[in-house]
Amino acid sequence: MSERVKVAILGSGNIGTDLMYKLLKNPGHMELVAVVGIDPKSEGLARARALGLEASHEGIAYILERPEIKIVFDATSAKAHVRHAKLLREAGKIAIDLTPAARGPYVVPPVNLKEHLDKDNVNLITCGGQATIPLVYAVHRVAPVLYAEMVSTVASRSAGPGTRQNIDEFTFTTARGLEAIGGAKKGKAIIILNPAEPPILMTNTVRCIPEDEGFDREAVVASVRAMEREVQAYVPGYRLKADPVFERLPTPWGERTVVSMLLEVEGAGDYLPKYAGNLDIMTASARRVGEVFAQHLLGKPVEEVVA
């Protein structure tokens, strides 16, 4: 492929390193030229150098001095991204934010990404959001959703200090995403860190209460399965354990029909272990978002952009 957009990764920890391997394995319309961190002894930077990439511990300053870099994946921290967002915007670079900072609009690739290709900063919400919002949206587009709830269970070993410090932000941000992007009038999010050994795969339970009782169950199943295939295009380990289940249950709105879905996410194992599907879905989604932005920067009409 002759035309490619130069991109860089800011943050050389687990997320940044896994994303590096994904971009090298499947570059699409992107050319990864640099991985940047702040720790000169970082394993991620050492791996980047070994793969022939530019690697710097000078932080964002290194990227700001490189006008040819058009897209920057920020895999640092929310606090750092608040500062980075302003600097990257002033430098004319697009920021794809993998932190909870949310300086730009939330994006979920198969749901609303193409609405935001004119933005210079987009946010990937949370791992639970990337996993469950597509399913809520899939129900909502055929049966408007009154209430959506997700319970995300991840291996304790896959949750580093950043995840643990951001548990409250996770629940708030994911619930907001269920509403703003999923379409639910009210959203609720719960995360559980499971210490079991060997570590479990990421599992998510999603429950939706449609507004009207007379919805088409077959249409809901078809919509959810179609969305599953869309997400599998960039997260191959994303799979429903069964078709959606419909049950009459007591709710705060009286006895209602509840749509329940059980979802499992297995990582690709590019750098992070396969059980860390919660981290893998973030890096896979980031790669997808970067690819769509790269095609758009190269002049491809929005309706023709594919990833």
Curated annotation (Swiss-Prot):
The keyword Electron transport does not apply. GO terms for molecular function: acetaldehyde dehydrogenase (acetylating) activity; NAD binding. Its EC number is 1.2.1.10, 1.2.1.87. One of its GO terms (biological process) is catabolic process. NAD(+) binds at residues 12-15, 158-166, 278. Has a half-life of only 1.6 hours at 50 degrees Celsius. When TTHB247 is in complex with TTHB246, its half-life is increased by approximately 4 hours. The active site is at 127 (acyl-thioester intermediate). It holds the Pfam family Semialdhyde_dh. It catalyses: acetaldehyde + NAD(+) + CoA = acetyl-CoA + NADH + H(+); propanal + NAD(+) + CoA = propanoyl-CoA + NADH + H(+). The keyword NAD applies. Keywords: Aromatic hydrocarbons catabolism, NAD, Oxidoreductase, Plasmid. Monomer. Can also form a heterotetramer composed of two aldolase (TTHB246) and two dehydrogenase (TTHB247) subunits. Upon complex formation, the aldolase shows a 5-fold increase in substrate affinity, while the dehydrogenase shows a 3-fold decrease; the kcat values of each enzyme are reduced by 2-fold when they are in a complex. Catalyzes the conversion of acetaldehyde or propanal to acetyl-CoA or propanoyl-CoA, respectively, using NAD(+) and coenzyme A. The aldehyde substrates can be directly channeled from the aldolase TTHB246 to the dehydrogenase TTHB247. Is the final enzyme in the meta-cleavage pathway for the degradation of aromatic compounds. Belongs to the acetaldehyde dehydrogenase family. This is Acetaldehyde dehydrogenase. It comes from Thermus thermophilus (strain ATCC 27634 / DSM 579 / HB8). The lineage of its organism: Bacteria, Thermotogati, Deinococcota, Deinococci, Thermales.
